[in-house]
Every structure is written in structure tokens, then in C-alpha cells.
Amino acid sequence: MGSEERQRLAQRAAWISLAATCVVVAVKLAGAALSGSISVLAEALQSILDVAMSAVVVWAVKVAAKPSDDDHPFGHSKAELLATAFQMLMALMVAGVIIWQAVPKLWAPTPIRPDWGLAAMGYAVVSNMIVAAWLRSTAKKTSATSLSGEAAHLVSDTMASVGILAGLLLYTFTQWTWIDPAAAILFTALGAVSVVKHIYQVV
């Protein structure tokens, strides 16, 4: 596969990832508003971060494709590394904010409507799994590290969504109101750990 073909594939994958994530954001925000679930809201905030990160990936892939010039005699490949570092930093910051907001709700929880949250999380899981698998495949073909970082973040988001689904199901059968904020804290923390691991892999 030639260099131009790899660049074209990487750019297309980045744009599709951005579009798919925008849809997931809309679905999760609707689910959070209708269910009143803080865990679903946390996932919606994570997905908003995904949109910002996907936009950065689109930029990084485009810049990395530029030929070398007088200011960049070795090309622009470092743009992807910078994009990956930015992705990881923003993910950790959002995780901290979510946990900070969810902890007080352990002691002051409120009833929720889990059906809307279940529908939103179910859609998010399926969408993210498909997009992440494609990004990984494209990253291997194109050697685009920013796509690899985006895929890793989507996998982390999917794991959190599965956990939120389980928590909402448990709430449905038990009506334990503390489950929702606990799920938000637990899976946000796990996502942060996944991000840190990916930093070491990239660096």
C-alpha cells in the first residue's frame, strides 16, 4: 500500500470516527436527560470528550500527511504523537471531574428511570465496538498512532458503557439508588487506568 493510499484511509477513518461519536453523544445526552442517571451523564460527558478527541485525530492525520518543508525537514509525523498526548491528558481531566461530581451522590442519591439509560448505553456499546475495531484495523494498515489512540479510548468507553448497563439492570431489579453514582465512579476510574496504560505503550 502506497503512502498516499495509507493517508487517505487514515483520514477517512478519522472522519467516520468523528461522525459516529457525534451520534453517540446525542444518544447518551438524551438518555441521561430522560433517565436522570448520573452514570449515563458521565458517559455522555466522556463521549463529548470523544468528539473533541476525534476532531484532534482528524487534524493530526491531516498534518502528518504533509510533506517535509524548510521548517520540518523530517516531515510532520510528530503531530500524531502530540495528538495522542493531548487525548490522554484530556481523558484524565474529564475522569477527575466526573468522579468529583459523583462521590457526593453516594450519600444523596435520587431515583432514576433506567429504561432510557439502558437504551442509550446499548446503542453506545454496539456503535463503539464497530468503530473501534475498524480504527484498529486501519491503524495497523496505515501506521497512524492517533487512530490507535482513538481506538483504545473507544474500547475503554465501551467497557464503561457495559458496566453502566449492568448497573442500570441491577438498579431495575433492586431499586438500590447508590448503584448509579457508584457505577459512574467505578467505570470512570477504570477508564482512567486504561488511559494511563496506553500512554506508556505510546511513549
Each language-model region and where it sits:
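Alpha-helical transmembrane segments and adjacent TM-loop junctions that form the membrane-embedded core
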Residues: G2-S17, V27, A33-S35, S39-V203
